[in-house]
Amino acid sequence: MRSFPQLSLLRLFLLLGLLGTSWAGVGGSISGTIKDPSGAAIAQSAVSLVNTGTGARQSATTDGRGTYTFPVLPIADYVLEVNHPGFKPYRRTGIALDANSALRVDAVLQVGERTDAITVSDNAAHVETSSSQMGEVIAGSMMTGVPLNGRSYTDLLALQSGVAPATSITSSTVQDVGASAFSPSGDLNAGNISINGQREFANSFMVNGSDVEEDVNMGTAIIPNLDSIAEFRILTNNFDAEYGEYSGGQINVITKSGSNAFHGDVFEFLRNTNLDARNYFSPSRGSFDQNQFGGTLGGPATRNKIFFYSDYQGTRQTQGVDTGLIPVPSIQDRSGNLADLASSLVTTVSGPAWATALSQNLGYQISVGEPYYFPGCTNTNYSATSTTACVLPTLQIPNSAWSAPAQHLLQYIPAPNQPGNVFSTSAYNQTLNDNKGAARLDASTPWGLISTYYFLDNFTQNNPYPTAQGGANVPGFNAVNLGRAQLLNLGSTKTPSATAVNEFRFSYLRDSNDLGRPQGGVGVNLASQGFQVGPNTPGIVPLSPQTEGLENVVFNNYSIGTDTNELRQSNNTFQWLDNFSKVVGTHTIKAGGEFHYDQVNTHAIAQFNGSFLFFGSQTGSDFVDFLLGAPTQYNQSQLQPFYGRNKYLGLYAQDSWRL
């Protein structure tokens, strides 16, 4: 999308990757106690954890109470190995570590020779946890095993108890000046939910520990390819101190990483119209075709050292949008014959200026207070004692009396195609073209565990009826939504000693959207539509000449013209975070801080070329008001920019004491 300024994140990603700045990903911790058969603690035991996917090994030594702790670990399956002179080697397999989990794995060593060994298999099941945090883990295999419309993890957030969907925000709807609920990937759920009664903007959304919130309505701006997600977790209560910025839930998505084995998949999901039913009120069945395709690939770049993982998903969607049943003017009405609208003409002429204008247009004297119509009325001069005079005695408005804009714009109001002067169609399609992909690089180096992650999502959505942006609900005035989301996170996890770990992370999120860019009806200047135009005139001054088009006109049941509320918004979030963990006896002390700088750049182009509203306030009929040129209201506003800047600094310290 050329309309958005962009940073060449890919080049920055490659450069920093070569420099070795990285991050190992958000994971959990494993601790436990080593004892002999009598229950006595065994000090100075050599404890090792081996990542079964990458072969990475970490080591620790038990203290005087026989305890060990690995305070910071990436999510993975692990093997625990314990050795001590005079005891048989102990080996425990299938230890599955999830995001933000704290597992307790104890071991009892048996007296014997080192040539003997004890192996215990956990079959990848969770073992006893030593964390007070409350939340649910949803594994990647669970997500890909259920049919999800749109293939988004946010559709599974309600599986957690205490979660309720929000109803105050509608995707792609302008909520206020400079505020809109954007849909990630064009039409996915941004995850605005209420957790344990908190407001929907009180939640934290993270991908690999990096902040990925859209900075206005606080939903997620990033939804990774479902096949690339290892798991996600919702923390709902008793968060650790490092999550103190938000009072709602903590939603953390962890993406897959490469391993010593090559693994990947290719997929294609097809949905079409074949089994769809026709809307009862529509003359035909709307089309629907959706293809979601892509794949993943991960493996070793250098065995036991450097690992990669990449993914791509494309979505192509064509969907016929049903207008529903829209009451429109009859063929008779469109000729100026108002016989079937007679019962609506129940008001009287208001104001001397309007009475003068009607007199000039109709060619006979009209007075203030004169009824527009009643059965048996005539066009005789009206007076306070008159009982027969009315404005439209023949219920016919000659073309010469129509307003100039009405003569030009009538052709854009659809004629009825259903009984009862109703228009309905599902022949016009909404289309979506979305491409998103990511690449992750992990490495075990002398500088620590290293990882880089880059995500890019581009989408274009064409909407035939952009009513959410003040556009028409009849054909001919489509608008497009354009979006791009990018995430780069870098970090390093270093182990300066057997009892200390330091994590550093930097991330950059850019989320850009152009919502409601007019397409249909653009390029028709206002002067050619019969309007007076230009400065120093009683007419319209176009404030956005590049989108000048057919004037927006709103009636009681339908509207025509280009949409009135285009919103261009780009958000930037820069985040720096550092955590330091130290094991001291039975205490695990963790301290750190986070700083992020948020930018919100918004251009709300609301009613840039004006909007006329006809609600029948003059004659009693919106269509008759339109023909005569008597709008209820006219709105126009200037460009409304908003540039928000926010700096956040948070520090914390926490001591987890194991009794």
List the predicted regions and their residue ranges.
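Periplasmic N-terminal accessory/gating domains of Gram-negative outer-membrane beta-barrel systems
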Residues: D63, F87-S257, H263, L270-S282, ...
